[in-house]
Amino acid sequence: MKHSTLALLLLVLALPASAAPDYSRLGKDLTPIGAERAGNADGTIPAWEGGLTEPPPGWTPEQGYVDPFPDDEPLFTITGENAAQYESKLTAGQVEMLRKFPEFRMNVYPTRRTAALPKAVTDRVRERAGQVRLESFGLKDLGGSTTPFPIPQNGLEVVWNHLVRYLGGGVIGAGHSFPVRASGDYYKIGFRAMRIYSENMDKPEPNRLFYALGYFTEPATLRGTIFLVHEPVDQVAEQRSAWIYNAGARRVRRAPDLNYDGVNDGSEGMFVTDQVDGYNGAPDRFEWKLLGKREVYVPYNTYKLGDKSIKYKDIIQKRTINPELVRYELHRVWVVEGTLKQGQRHIYGKRSFYIDEDSWTVVAEDAYDTRGGLWRFAQHGIMQCYDAVLPCYRFGIFHDLTNGAYFVGGLDNEIREPRQYNAKGRIADFQPDALRRLGGTL
């Protein structure tokens, strides 16, 4: 929870600003949530044919998300030596990683457009298309849509599509994260979290998107620290509310740093609060510019990394995770550039987000310091959670391009408990007073 300018902008498929959205295209030449159904001209991106909606035969949740494509082989590998020939399909952060760190390479596999959502979810997107609106940087009249702007007209609309994307109504799960220093030394952080959306609460409250509660399970210095977030929909009318329970002091306090560029426990300062989940929180501190669409090699269908037979010691390496375990595919992504507004505060002066067209999920971020230098690079490997019928993150990794340190989170190879989607919640369990009760049991 607590956690450049683009080198080349080829294959830009930006929607003309003057074109009014034609929502009748949804489910026709566009997918139900607005991606281009057709493949690309040279056949390296196939047409979308409904995505992956069933688990492999014989699958059980205790196995974790096993790879439904075990026989796929890499088509080629991008390294620092051959990166120039692929640069038009790389992010600035990928180019810099390839240039600086020979340990980083990218195995590129055939593209499989596995993203899919339940029909009831996509039906609601279509019903609400054209009715949701922006007011300043906030969202109005969401009405249960999880893709408020399926044919986006500006960068802020794309950002909001990511922020409210469908994540199963509620999810409970545990994971391990690893801060990895430039020397290669690392340690393990355990965290358990639940995020319950308003519609899955026993007593839904107005203007509430979700409730999140999480706590550290290890190391001992962090164990028992609990976080609570109430996330609003309309962030003009109401800001995020957050609290923290400190196990040592046994008290609950407000947590204003659980927002924007706050640096939180367990992060080692390698990422900031609004980078969790690709991007989260109020988008009001940046001016958002839609640069269009690009074809980019991004971590996709990254099931192999979560194989329960693979131990963390086989994943964590110096300067990056084991590249043999990461699958890259060519996908169309929306590119949105955020520039820090005059008079606002944030450690990043500019950031470029790459958002998968099939799922509205942030899959990469180039982050620049306030002097304009490329500072950090994040990648978020996604996969289709076929039992819940939704795209979800397999891992998130934050690279410091200045020194080779990184932070990787979201791993659960050595955890037996499966994720639980469509989880329900009680409002009473997501109140500040409940943190003390929970803290006494940890």
What are these model-predicted stretches?
Residues K2-L9:
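Sec-dependent signal peptide recognition
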Residues E414-L442:
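Long, C-terminal catalytic modules of enzymes
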Residues Y23-G50, I78, T91, L213-G281, ...:
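Gly/Pro-enriched, hydrophobic low-complexity segments
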Residues G175-A182, Y186-E218, L222, V276-F353, ...:
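Extended beta-strand-rich segments in extracellular/periplasmic secretory proteins, especially
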Residues Y23-R240, N246:
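Solvent-exposed N-terminal domain segments of exported/luminal and surface proteins
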Residues A14-A17:
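N-terminal signal peptide c-region/cleavage motif recognized by signal peptidases
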